[in-house]
Swiss-Prot record:
It comes from Brucella melitensis biotype 1 (strain ATCC 23456 / CCUG 17765 / NCTC 10094 / 16M). GO terms for cellular component: cytosol. Its EC number is 5.3.1.9. Its main location: cytoplasm. GO terms for molecular function: carbohydrate derivative binding; glucose-6-phosphate isomerase activity; monosaccharide binding. It catalyses: alpha-D-glucose 6-phosphate = beta-D-fructose 6-phosphate. PANTHER family: GLUCOSE-6-PHOSPHATE ISOMERASE. This is Glucose-6-phosphate isomerase.
């Protein structure tokens, strides 16, 4: 069926009415009255548990949300994506990051062409190159083994590889991985300063080989290599992830060190492609294939499972409920796993660049809120930074906890138990809160004077009723990481379909880039600032004055 705008609008209205009527409901009372609540509002896929029972929903909520998914034709749009249809309508492109991890023998067609053999060819080339670097068969220009790789990219060419490489640290042997993204010269200077060009491989990740930040840093790195080892050494110390073979050749990188990908792969969905080359070199081709396999398992589940048993669909529906119906403007991603410390930033781009839109697929203004602000930090660090606001602030911010049942350090299992206890405690505290009477009783138990009890008790009240969901997996390994990332990718897709927006373009990044190009000669003093707004003129004048001071 096609998207039913009339039914969609009616269901949204029913959801808003339902929220207004059920909002005062106390979550502690809901759990006390319903021992089966956890069982009804949780799902498992193998070892992965998704629990949303601490969100402010009931059976009517879930029935209406499923009705919403049907009206939005989530299943039809999902089928269109997997079939290679051009669902990215503003750029007239297919959206097939799922093909990058498809290990089946089925055809995946884009405009009549089966792309799976192309995907396999690039993956095999990546594996051969990674094995060569890791084994020392592919050496630097002076004959030394490569001990360090530096990935130069930005956005999707950086956030995914950084996140995955850090997350899979227990699977590293060598070489060491480093990442440069910012145009700020301090980033590349600090990265290169402790390294030796003779044992360093630099990967330049830019599809067009024109991305200003990436190419500026790449030229700096090229000069670093050439000044030390000579111009002829450049080819042995660089590789590229790009489709612009002419530009790559002009830079000095041999074609056999160039790895391409396709326009049906968006940047924020590209870690599965050649963009993941630094990850593959760091953890090895076998582990990278396990990473792909985990994502593919989630793809199959998302494609085949019924709506009410489908983890990405349920996660997306809860996300929509929080954003569009409850009116919560942000969501906090809190992985209780230090190695997932870059996951919030990765999901920030995935979600906000995808669903930060204000027009519908047909170019009309949206009728309600779209994607939330996404942010977060790993636990327990966040508890000592911003959890105060989450517990007692005036804004309700849903939390998404992620934790593993087991860690990689068996001799430190007691610390992992403390980590898990903190994660579950925060989830429980947000839901239960603490009443004024409970705060008084706690203070009275300390034999404090009555006046002090009355003075302090209001400050120790927690409203509770603050929603959170929890994802638990066995252990963070390549398969688990791939499955987790694919879960969030498909969650974003589901929310976008209900919002009625295109999750696969990013025109919002263009205007600032255009103006930066115009302003560069102004900032450098080659052109004047006349014709620009008074604020920009004043800022330019101040910068010029301070640079001369």
């Amino acid at each position: 069926m096609a998207r039913d705008a009339t039914k969609l609008e009616a269901t949204v209205a029913k959801l808003k009415k339902h929220w207004a009527e059920s909002a005062p409901r106390d979550m502690r009372a809901a759990f006390s009255a319903d021992p089966g609540r956890f069982g009804r509002y949780s799902l498992c896929l193998d070892d992965l548990l998704f629990d949303w029972s601490k969100c402010r929903v009931n059976d009517e909520t879930m029935a209406l949300l499923k009705e919403l998914a049907v009206a939005a034709d989530v299943e039809g749009r999902r089928a269109a994506m997997f079939a290679g249809e051009h669902i990215n309508n503003t750029e007239d492109r297919a959206v097939l990051h799922v093909a990058l991890r498809d290990t089946s023998s089925k055809e995946v067609l884009v405009d009549g062409h089966n792309v799976l053999p192309d995907v396999k060819h690039v993956l095999d080339r990546m594996a051969a190159f990674a094995d060569g670097i890791r084994s020392g068969a592919l050496k630097g220009a002076t004959g030394r083994k490569i001990t360090d790789i530096v990935n130069i990219g930005i956005g999707g060419s950086d956030l995914g590889p950084v996140m995955a490489t850090l997350a899979l640290a227990p699977y590293h042997d060598e070489p060491r991985a480093h990442f440069v993204s910012n145009i700020d010269g301090a980033h590349i200077a600090d990265t290169l300063s402790p390294l030796d060009p003779a044992s360093t491989l630099i990967i330049v990740a830019s599809k067009t080989f024109t991305t200003i930040e990436t190419m500026t840093n790449a030229q700096t790195a090229r000069k670093w290599v050439a000044d030390t080892l000579g111009e002829a050494a450049v080819g042995a110390h660089f590789a590229a992830v790009s489709t612009a073979l002419d530009k790559v050749a002009a830079f000095g990188i041999p074609e056999d060190r160039v790895f391409g990908f396709w326009d049906w792969v968006g940047g924020r969905y590209s870690v599965w492609s050649a963009i993941g080359l630094p990850v593959m070199i760091a953890v090895g081709p076998d582990n990278f294939r396990k990473f792909l396999a985990g994502a593919h398992a989630m793809d199959v589940h998302f494609r085949d499972a019924p709506l009410e048993k489908n983890l990405p669909v349920m996660l997306g529906l809860i996300g929509y409920w929080h954003r569009a119906i409850c009116g919560y403007g942000s969501r906090a991603i809190i992985p209780y796993d230090q190695r997932l410390s870059r996951l919030p930033a990765y999901l920030q781009q995935l979600d906000m660049e995808s669903n930060g839109k204000s027009v519908t697929l047909d170019g009309k203004p949206v009728s309600g809120p779209t994607g939330p602000v996404v942010w977060g930090e790993p636990g327990t660090n966040g508890q000592h930074a911003f959890f105060q606001l989450l517990h007692q602030g005036t804004d309700t911010i849903p939390l998404e906890f992620i934790v593993a049942a087991k860690g990689h350090e068996p001799t430190l299992d007691h610390q992992h138990e403390m980590l898990m206890a903190n994660c579950l405690a925060q989830s429980e505290a947000l839901m239960k809160g603490r009443t004024l009477d409970e705060a008084r009783a706690q203070l009275q138990a300390k034999n404090l004077p009555a006046s002090q009890v009355e003075r302090i008790a209001p400050h120790r009240v927690f409203s509770g009723n603050r929603p959170s969901l929890t994802l638990i997996h066995d252990m963070l390994d390549p398969y688990t990481l791939g499955r987790l990332i694919a879960l969030y990718e498909h969650r974003v897709f589901v929310e976008a379909q209900i919002f009625g927006i295109n999750a696969f373009d990013q025109w919002g990044v263009e205007l600032g880039k255009e103006l930066a190009t115009e302003l560069l000669p102004v900032v450098s003093g080659k052109e004047g600032a006349s014709g620009r707004d008074a604020s920009t003129q004043g800022l330019v004048a101040h910068l010029h004055a301070r640079r001369k001071a």
